[in-house]
Amino acid sequence: MQVLRTPESRFAGLADWPFAPHYAEITDAGGARLRLHYVDEGPRDGAPVLLMHGEPSWAYLYRKIIPALAARGHRVIAPDLIGFGRSDKPAARGDYTYERHVAWMSAWLEGLDLRGLTLFCQDWGGLIGLRLVAAFPERFAGLVIANTGLPTGAGMTDGFKAWLDFSQNVPEMPIGLIVNMGTGRDLTPAEIAAYDAPFPDETYKEGARQFPMLVPVTPEHASVAENLAAWKVLEHFPGPVVTAFSDGDPVTRGGEAIFQSRMPGALGQPHRTLRGGHFLQEDCPDDIVDIVDAVARPESQS
């Protein structure tokens, strides 16, 4: 496996990004060693919060949420998925599969050995993060689920069809502009540049190119069986489950219903519909902080 590593200089002086990098080395099933980056802020003994990003962003998406949750006493951990952010980037599209992403993040999570986690997940952060919950339910105390899903081959929305077509056919993938198109507010040039920073050129974007192809939208997809098995675990997850989908996301709009109906911890919870686009972390970070804080406070889990 050929692995690319974005030069550290690409991350110097990013707007609103004061966080020290942390790195963990994981070993792929094929023997390749991969360096995974994560942010780890707040008190070590704070109630831990795991923030998981998706396509095609990185932990920068949580830059306004991380310090606010840390200020409320939480230990806040935000990893970059392999292929994104400061994490290593396999150079071949064929190196990226759904199951490999789950395995990579599982190895990282086991290495940290955290328990009592509250997960906030959006986009592929949910497709992978919810698989982590199913694999390690004993490590998670509560979930906040936003603009994501755990599909099992039942088709796709028109919004996802449009995104799939765009992602596979655009000659050069404009990462920062893609994020900007998925927000309710206009990002600044400096913010757009920060989303572009992990990708010096197109060779670094194979993970971003491949992600849309990995969503299990057809019954024959290789990961349908694994997601069905994950749902069987999630349907018995005992902790609180709060949905926080946005009203302006054509890809996942309405997706909260399946979580509210199938997960017992969602019953009677203060679910929210937030005003924002697909990347609602950019549009309503304060709301997200309040929601996550309410779920993650130890007294709310007693």
Swiss-Prot record:
Name this polypeptide is given: Haloalkane dehalogenase
Family: Belongs to the haloalkane dehalogenase family. Type 1 subfamily.
Record lineage: Bacteria, Pseudomonadati, Pseudomonadota, Alphaproteobacteria, Caulobacterales
Origin superkingdom: Bacteria
UniProt KW keywords: Hydrolase
Summary of the function given for this chain in its UniProt record: Catalyzes hydrolytic cleavage of carbon-halogen bonds in halogenated aliphatic compounds, leading to the formation of the corresponding primary alcohols, halide ions and protons.
Subunit field text: Monomer.
Record carries keyword Hydrolase: yes
Reaction(s) catalysed (UniProt annotation): 1-haloalkane + H2O = a halide anion + a primary alcohol + H(+)
InterPro entries: AB_hydrolase_1, AB_hydrolase_fold, Epox_hydrolase-like, Haloalkane_dehalogenase, Haloalkane_dehalogenase_1
Domain AB hydrolase-1: from-to ranges: 48-150
EC number per UniProt: 3.8.1.5
Active site: 123, 249, 278
Top EC class for this record: hydrolase
GO molecular function: epoxide hydrolase activity; haloalkane dehalogenase activity
